[in-house]
């Protein structure tokens, strides 16, 4: 008799994705971040659902409803901080996951990679709208500044901004629609993640060497199920250390002041995971130019597969490319630091140089390094 997990229409899907899936025997812990992102997504949807039960999306009561969650709702404080810091863990995993893809050449799976880029955009949009909901000073001014960037679009810009706002400023209509979008987007992200997996399972996973491993694949269960569970436990451990010891470490103190349209905070800045993009935005002294650079800083990932000039897939045996990769990582850390600094000398020039370096590394230096390596290997 055949096993039910191999014949039942629903269980067959689960079986082929998580149990009998042929997996490379040598994938490292860098391949854990996909499952960790799934864990984060489930955690965010669950904590978000319970927060939504007590939150009110009205400008008069939004701030106090969040305070009410923290003070009066049973374990409301832990749900709120798990959700806020869960977003930070989500982005740490996202950046690691994208970095892994860049390093080991996983971007050659075009459909999987491009859906991943769409997922990154969707997650950033969700996080931005979620940050607006507590209706603190940084929520309000962050929403005002970022939505205002759309006014840089020629001809339709101003109308577009007012349409998104639902009025002539960020107000009740804006907050209500942001709450609606923030609620629906994670489910769209879940659907996209399933498509992401679907395309990945068409080709099978890459591995650190970048060499096809079809000859010696192993079943996903029990080897990688246990590995993923260990990863998830470590993720939850780090998250709970943040939540229980320093819940406000990654937040902005300004967001504990209720939103006031008449009082602008001295330094408007987004959450830490957007600072690199914010630094690129600010480094260009032209509004439209800044907006384009901001979008291109993420959209450039779509070009990466077409800039791959190496004869090898992975960077594992390519020291010059490795050097370029770590230059890019250092540059992104520099941009993150600059994004949180005031707009004054010397930060302006450092930000501009780091922004140029970012695009130069991806568009010129990495493909050049690959070509040099090909020549050194006489390929």
Curated annotation (Swiss-Prot):
- Where along the chain is heme b b566 bound? 97, 196
Keywords (alphabetical) are: Electron transport, Heme, Iron, Membrane, Metal-binding, Mitochondrion, Mitochondrion inner membrane, Respiratory chain, Transmembrane, Transmembrane helix, Transport, Ubiquinone
* TM spans (from-to): 33-53, 77-98, 113-133, 178-198, 226-246, 288-308, 320-340, 347-367
Q: Name one GO molecular function term.
A: ubiquinol-cytochrome-c reductase activity
* Record-level GO cellular component terms: mitochondrial inner membrane; respiratory chain complex III
The positions annotated for binding heme b b562 are 83, 182
Residue positions binding a ubiquinone: 201
Q: Which CDD domains match?
A: cytochrome_b_C, Cytochrome_b_N
Give the UniProt record's GO annotations in the biological process aspect.
Answer: mitochondrial electron transport, ubiquinol to cytochrome c
Task: Establish whether keyword Transport is in the entry.
Answer: yes
Q: How is the cofactor bound?
A: Binds 2 heme b groups non-covalently.
Cofactor section? heme b
Major localization class? mitochondrion
Membrane topology of the entry: Multi-pass membrane protein
Question: Where found?
Answer: Mitochondrion inner membrane
Q: Which PROSITE patterns match?
A: CYTB_CTER, CYTB_NTER
Q: Which family does it belong to?
A: Belongs to the cytochrome b family.
Quaternary structure per UniProt? The cytochrome bc1 complex contains 11 subunits: 3 respiratory subunits (MT-CYB, CYC1 and UQCRFS1), 2 core proteins (UQCRC1 and UQCRC2) and 6 low-molecular weight proteins (UQCRH/QCR6, UQCRB/QCR7, UQCRQ/QCR8, UQCR10/QCR9, UQCR11/QCR10 and a cleavage product of UQCRFS1). This cytochrome bc1 complex then forms a dimer.
| Function, as annotated | Component of the ubiquinol-cytochrome c reductase complex (complex III or cytochrome b-c1 complex) that is part of the mitochondrial respiratory chain. The b-c1 complex mediates electron transfer from ubiquinol to cytochrome c. Contributes to the generation of a proton gradient across the mitochondrial membrane that is then used for ATP synthesis.
Q: What is this protein called?
A: Cytochrome b
Q: Which organism is it from?
A: Capra ibex
């Amino acid at each position: 008799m055949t096993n039910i997990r191999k014949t039942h229409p629903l269980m067959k899907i689960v079986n082929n994705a998580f149990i009998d899936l042929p997996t490379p025997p040598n994938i490292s812990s860098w391949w854990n971040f996909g499952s960790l992102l799934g864990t984060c997504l489930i955690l965010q949807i669950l904590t978000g659902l319970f927060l939504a039960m007590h939150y009110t999306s009205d400008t008069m009561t939004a701030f106090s409803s969040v305070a009410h969650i923290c003070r009066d709702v049973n374990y409301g404080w832990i749900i709120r901080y798990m959700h806020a810091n869960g977003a930070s863990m989500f982005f740490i995993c996202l950046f690691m996951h994208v970095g892994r893809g860049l390093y080991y050449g996983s971007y050659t799976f075009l459909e999987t990679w491009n859906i991943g880029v769409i997922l990154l955009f969707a997650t950033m949009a969700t996080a931005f709208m979620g940050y607006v909901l507590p209706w603190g000073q940084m929520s309000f001014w962050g929403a005002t500044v970022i939505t205002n960037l759309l006014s840089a679009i020629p001809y339709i810009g101003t109308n577009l901004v007012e349409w998104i706002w639902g009025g002539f400023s960020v107000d009740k209509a804006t907050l209500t629609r942001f709450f609606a979008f923030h609620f629906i987007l994670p489910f769209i992200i879940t659907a996209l993640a399933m498509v992401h997996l679907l395309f990945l399972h068409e080709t099978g996973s890459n591995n650190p060497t970048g060499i096809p491993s079809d000859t010696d694949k192993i079943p996903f269960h029990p080897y990688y199920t246990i590995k993923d569970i260990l990863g998830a436990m470590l993720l939850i451990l780090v998250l709970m250390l943040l939540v229980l010891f320093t819940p406000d470490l990654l937040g902005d103190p300004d967001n504990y002041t209720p939103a006031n349209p008449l009082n602008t905070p001295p330094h408007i800045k987004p959450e830490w995971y957007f600072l690199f993009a914010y630094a690129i935005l600010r480094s260009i002294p032209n509004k439209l130019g800044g907006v384009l650079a901001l979008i291109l800083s993420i959209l450039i990932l779509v070009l990466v597969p077409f800039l791959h000039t190496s004869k090898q897939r992975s960077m594992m045996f390519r020291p010059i490319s490795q050097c370029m990769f770590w230059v890019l990582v250092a540059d992104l850390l520099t941009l993150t630091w600059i994004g949180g600094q005031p707009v004054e000398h010397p930060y302006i020039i450092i930000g501009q140089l780091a922004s140029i370096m970012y695009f130069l590394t991806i568009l010129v230096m990495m493909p050049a390094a690959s070509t040099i390596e090909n020549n050194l290997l006489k390929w």
